Curated annotation (Swiss-Prot):
Endonuclease that specifically degrades the RNA of RNA-DNA hybrids. PROSITE patterns: RNASE_H_2. Belongs to the RNase HII family. The keyword Manganese applies. Residues 1-181 form the RNase H type-2 domain. This is Ribonuclease HII. InterPro entries: RNase_HII, RNase_HII/HIII, RNase_HII/HIII_dom, RNaseH-like_sf, RNaseH_sf. Manganese or magnesium. Binds 1 divalent metal ion per monomer in the absence of substrate. May bind a second metal ion after substrate binding. Gene3D superfamilies: Ribonuclease H-like superfamily/Ribonuclease H. NCBIfam families: PRK00015.1-3. Its EC number is 3.1.26.4. It comes from Borrelia recurrentis (strain A1). GO terms for cellular component: cytoplasm; ribonuclease H2 complex. Transmembrane segments: none annotated.
Length: 181
């Protein structure tokens, strides 16, 4: 069994960093449609996410902005990956993570693959479901904090988001260790 792990929300200034771990139950027929979540349209991501969730074992983990501020985004991303894998509770022959760094995971083999979210099906799948999950969370936060445009900016430091911070102030879910304005 191969497990792919990726995270989303590293560059955001609002909310958690979120990771997903994915193991396909069998080889699905839609693998050729997978790609890095950033390269797919919202509609395509949501469609593929539903297929992935039906055809894979998966787990999510998020690390709050407070913890990000305490341990930094790099360590928080690795921790999210570690927890997502642990939540799967399935032993894998090979764990593949997107990026340069390996989280603290007990596995027979583990490898970090730069641009893995564009090359490895399991990492692509993790990228997609993590992005869809975090985007849904931002839509929910937008209902609570409509002045910050979270539905549109997804917590990233857009001009509109930074202008909203200048005008309305920093929220408890903003990452204080990041340059907010």
């Amino acid at each position: 069994m191969i497990c792919g792990i990726d995270e989303v929300g590293r560059g955001c200034i609002f909310g958690p960093v979120l990771s997903a771990a994915v193991i396909f139950k069998t080889k699905p027929n839609f693998l050729n449609e997978l790609d890095d979540s950033k390269k797919l349209t919202k509609t395509k991501r949501e469609y593929l996410s539903s297929l992935i969730l039906e055809n894979a074992y998966y787990a999510f983990a998020d690390i709050s902005n407070e913890i990000i501020d305490k341990i930094n985004i790099h360590n928080a991303s690795l921790l999210a990956m570690q927890i997502a894998y642990q939540k799967l509770n399935i032993e894998c022959n090979l764990v593949l993570v997107d990026g340069k760094f390996i989280p603290k995971i007990q596995a027979k083999q583990i490898r970090a693959i730069i641009k893995g979210d564009s090359m490895i099906d399991e990492i692509k799948a993790a990228s997609i479901i993590a992005k869809v999950q975090r985007d849904k969370l931002m839509v929910e936060y937008d209902k609570i904090y409509p002045l910050y445009g979270l539905k549109k900016n997804k917590g990233y430091p857009t001009k509109e988001h930074k202008d909203a911070i200048k005008k309305h102030g920093i929220l408890s879910l903003h990452r204080k260790s990041f340059r907010l304005i």
